Amino acid sequence: MSKLDYGFNIPALKVMKLKEIQTPCLLSDYETFKINVEKMRSFTHENNIKLRPHAKMHKSVEVAKYQLQYGNASGICCQKLSEAEVFVSSGIKDILITNQITDL
């Protein structure tokens, strides 16, 4: 196990009680999520622009990969180098770190 493997791989199911869900956990209506990604893909395609979604809301490799594959995204943004490391280790290569990196 590398330092990037955190072990949070237990999916939350609709039948689970809130106290049974391992946290932190991203909960989303998958159909609405897909519709929103498609709307952004259509908008960016029609206006000849690229989207670079920020991963700070979801912090999810799976969501970022979906946005890249289906959402006309040119890459992703994240806040910190440690977040970028997780995305790079999962195969995402086009990442913009939106904060300054210092040696402090």
What are these regions (language model features)?
Residues H54-L104:
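Active-site-proximal beta-alpha core segment in soluble small-molecule metabolic enzymes
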Residues M1-G7:
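N-terminal hydrophobic targeting/anchoring segments and the immediately downstream early-domain regions
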Residues E20-T23, T44-E46, A64-Y66, I92:
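A generic short-segment signal for beta-strand/edge and adjacent turn/coil regions
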Residues S2, K17, Y70-N72:
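Serine/threonine-rich low-complexity intrinsically disordered regions
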Residues N9-S28:
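Generic N-terminal amphipathic, Lys/Arg-enriched alpha-helix
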Residues Q22-Y30, K50-H54, Y70-I76:
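Active-site mouth loops of central-metabolism enzymes
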Residues K14-L18, F43, S74:
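Bulky hydrophobic/aromatic packing residues
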Residues F8-L13, T32-K65:
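N-terminal glycine-rich anion-binding loops that anchor highly charged ligand groups
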